[in-house]
Regions:
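N-terminal basic/disordered segments at the start of proteins
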Residues: 1-13
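Alpha/beta enzyme core
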Residues: 13-14, 18-82, 87-173
Length: 173
């Protein structure tokens, strides 16, 4: 638990206000309008002093010199089909917790889907990643997306972040 606590303290501000910038969209969305040079964009983001950034492993590795010691790094370890695919594919594991730790990550981010076709497999992935995170002292952050649900209630997502949840998530978006 010591590793998780140390890493969580780097991610979360003590004043209760935390800014996390997501920059992991390129893996599935391709080039994003307004972001022509990811390195320059990251330099600008880091200069703004957010608490953490969410990045894909390759971006972390290529930009370690501008990230290290300046911002908490959250590594996206699941991914889906790209926007170029004819059919959406639910997230799969694309790298390991061990690899994320080896490149300096303070936490890992996984996507979860509830209320639709991707629910069972995504919850299984979150559970397996949660176990690995517990073994390695790595915080798990889950992004939960409701699918095919007729409610806008946050209750299904919130229930997965309850203390004692089998998902072991430290944060949920």
């Amino acid at each position: 638990m010591t590793g998780k606590l140390i890493r969580m303290n780097r991610i979360l501000e003590t004043d209760g206000k935390t800014v996390i910038v997501a920059m992991d969209h390129g893996q599935f969305q391709g080039p994003i309008e307004g972001i022509k040079n990811i390195r320059k964009t990251l330099e600008n983001i880091v200069a703004g002093e957010p608490d953490a950034v969410i990045l894909n492993p390759g971006v972390i590795e290529k930009n370690a010199d501008i990230l290290g010691g300046k911002v908490s790094i959250l590594c996206r370890i699941t991914g889906a089909s790209t926007n170029y695919s004819a059919m959406f594919d639910y997230h799969r594991i694309t790298t390991t917790v061990e690899h994320a730790a080896s490149i300096g990550s303070d936490g890992v981010v996984v996507m979860g889907f509830i209320g639709g076709n991707g629910e069972n497999s995504s919850l299984e992935i979150i559970g397996r990643i949660g176990e690995e995170c517990s073994k390695r002292g790595m915080p798990l952050i889950t992004e939960m997306l409701p699918q095919a649900m007729e409610t806008t209630s946050p209750t299904p997502s919130i229930s997965l972040s309850e203390p004692g949840s089998p998902m072991n998530s430290e944060l949920i978006f």
